[in-house]
Swiss-Prot record:
Cystine pairs: none
Reported function: Mediates the reversible addition of palmitate to target proteins, thereby regulating their membrane association and biological function. Responsible for the modification of a subset of proteins that are critical in cryptococcal pathogenesis, with substrates involved in cell wall synthesis, signal transduction, and membrane trafficking. Palmitoylates chitin synthase CHS3.
Protein name: Palmitoyltransferase PFA4
Subcellular location: Endoplasmic reticulum membrane
EC number annotated for this UniProt entry: 2.3.1.225
Deleted gene: phenotype: Displays morphological changes and shows increases in adherence to and engulfment by host macrophages. Causes dramatic defects in cryptococcal morphology, stress tolerance, and virulence.
Source organism (scientific name): Cryptococcus neoformans var. grubii serotype A (strain H99 / ATCC 208821 / CBS 10515 / FGSC 9487)
One example of a Gene Ontology biological process annotation: establishment of protein localization to plasma membrane
Length: 456
């Protein structure tokens, strides 16, 4: 009840603000300016201004009273054909809203303030006391555009009035000054704020996106950049012209005229380059590391991986790793396909309908420079700038040269290291021949300077 009352306050305040900007300027600024007489010049100002005000109120009313679109009562997805539902990746079950106790179609979301699920939810707008969704998104964009048109024309009239006073040295009355100040103080912030908001929503309409889906695309881009999922394409972008037609109507001449939304809001056309019609049911892909039951890491996995257990193309496996792979029995990931909690973020569909988590590393390199990896297999070409992995031997350290060796010798005498405790010469080996490495304390020390003087 409290939320509904506050919603009425927001709507009432918006109506008062629009009315003040639209009518106070006509009654207290424009009408006295033209001597309170009807003329052609006066009509050229009042007719466009009142037309814009009428369209603003009309579209605003439609935004307030038009429902964004609810999920039809009793609507259930066709699980067998996966028609009209958005599946939860991994469990292959449709998205279900526990609060509303019904299934959720693609692009539908639950609004906590309205406490219901809306089709193609964009955001909850307090200024209209309603959510912006499938059936009123066009009304909302038209309302913003008409506010831009009306406030721009209003500011032009106010500036002309100020220039007229300055040019003809006409002494304005106190009422003229006050209402000029009040109109500028109210119209300029509205023009700036609504203007920026309009640009953003027109941008979303050109990409056939919503505010929520804009956040989802940013999150997906981050997952791709970090190599957690395969590169995927936003499925609903079908071209700028078709995108705008899907929101504002099929006739471009009537885009600013209120009209009924086409479609049912349960399914949407998909860009063929992003996949088939089923692609919309797998958007957005989720972070596989945050799933309740993440996929197990196969035994043959390497510590040097690049997303979804795939190899970084800039790293080459060592000979020891290749030998270990050839000797280690391979664990088939299909053994884990019975796990219900597995959530595949993306990938190719298998024959049994599941989604493979393995992927090629190339799609992850969209934001980075890509260098060809080294010749891991016969016949592969070799390029420059190939980073290599150095894998040292545990328990070895390289002794520094120069004065440090002398200081280390003095420390040997003080500590009392015994060479015989750390090294036993082989039979027939001269014990007085310098060795390139020896046991000092806990470490095997390798001295490259001694190696140069070592002779067999």
């Amino acid at each position: 009840m409290a939320a509904r009352n506050w919603s009425r306050v927001w709507v009432g305040g918006t109506v008062i603000l629009i009315s003040f900007i639209a009518f106070s300027s006509q009654i207290f600024v424009i009408w006295p300016w033209y001597g309170r007489e009807i003329s052609l010049d006066l009509l050229m100002l009042l007719v466009p201004l009142n037309l814009a005000a009428f369209m603003i109120f009309w579209n605003y009313r439609l935004c307030v009273i038009t429902s964004p679109g609810t999920v039809p009562e009793g609507w259930r997805p066709n699980i067998g054909a996966m028609d009209g539902m958005e599946v939860k990746k991994g469990t292959h079950t449709p998205r279900y809203c526990k609060n509303c106790a019904h299934y959720k179609p693609p692009r539908a979301h639950h609004c906590r303030q309205c406490k219901t699920c809306w089709l193609k939810l964009d955001h909850h707008c307090p200024w209209i006391g309603n959510c912006v969704g499938f059936y009123n998104q066009g009304h909302f964009i038209r309302f913003l555009l008409w506010v831009d048109i009306g406030t721009t024309f209003h500011l032009i009239i106010m500036v002309r009035r100020v220039l007229y006073i300055a040019e003809y040295y006409h002494e304005p009355t106190l009422a003229d000054v006050l209402f000029l100040v009040f109109n500028f103080a109210t119209c300029v912030p509205v023009w700036l704020c609504v203007g920026m908001f309009s640009i953003y929503h027109v941008y979303l309409a050109c990409g056939n996106s919503t505010t929520i889906e804009g956040w989802e695309k940013d999150k997906v881009a981050t997952l791709i950049r970090r190599g957690k999922i395969k590169e995927v394409k936003y499925p609903y972008n079908i071209g700028i012209y078709k995108n705008i037609k899907s929101v504002l109507g099929p006739n471009p001449l009537l885009w600013l005229w209120p009209q009924k939304m086409q479609g049912d809001g349960l399914s949407f056309p998909v860009n063929p380059s992003a996949g088939d019609h089923m692609t919309q049911y797998f958007w957005p892909p989720q972070d596989p590391s945050r799933l309740p039951n993440p996929p197990p890491i196969p035994a043959h996995a390497s510590p040097f991986v690049y997303g979804n257990n795939g190899f970084n193309p800039n790293l080459r496996p060592t000979n020891s790793l290749r030998a270990r792979r050839s000797s280690t029995p391979r664990i088939d990931e299909d053994e884990y396909s019975h796990e219900q909690g597995r959530h595949y973020s993306s990938g190719d569909e298998r024959d049994n309908g599941s989604i493979s988590a393995s992927s090629s590393p190339e799609p992850y390199l969209s934001d980075y420079d890509h260098y060809d990896e080294g010749p891991m297999y016969p016949g592969e070409r070799m390029t420059t700038l190939v980073p290599r992995v150095r894998r040292g031997s545990e328990g070895w350290e390289v002794a520094p040269g120069g004065g440090w060796n002398a200081y280390a010798g003095m420390m040997d005498e003080e500590v009392g290291w015994d060479d015989e405790a750390g090294y036993d010469e082989a039979p027939g080996e001269d014990p007085y021949v310098e060795r390139p490495w020896e046991m000092r304390g806990r470490y095997n020390v390798y001295d490259p300077e001694e190696e140069s003087g070592y002779t067999h």
